[in-house]
Swiss-Prot record:
Its main location: membrane. Signal peptide: none annotated. This is Sec-independent protein translocase protein TatA. Residues 47-59 have a biased composition (Basic and acidic residues). The gene is tatA. GO terms for biological process: protein transport by the Tat complex. It is a single-pass membrane protein.
Length: 78
């Protein structure tokens, strides 16, 4: 009694197609699919960034040595 039958769903689908047209519905579907793909891609990138963040910090001496070698390289290139 309280449920929606297949015929009622079919009538609703026909009305939606008549109101919006197939081209607009196709465009909405592709936009929705693109949004879902983008969301999944962003979630995967976030996971990889978390993995990259799991590193051991360098000591200050190592950081100073690296900065010195980088500045020497920059001076040589200029």
């Amino acid at each position: 009694m309280g449920g929606i039958s297949i015929w009622q769903l079919l009538i609703i689908a026909v009305i939606v197609v008549l109101l919006f047209g197939t081209k607009k519905l196709r465009g909405i579907g592709s936009d929705l699919g693109g949004a879902i793909k983008g969301f999944k891609k962003a979630m995967n990138e976030e996971e990889s960034e978390k993995k990259d963040a799991d590193f051991e910090p360098k000591s200050l001496e190592q950081q100073n040595k690296q900065a010195a070698t980088e500045s020497k390289k920059d001076k040589e290139q200029a």
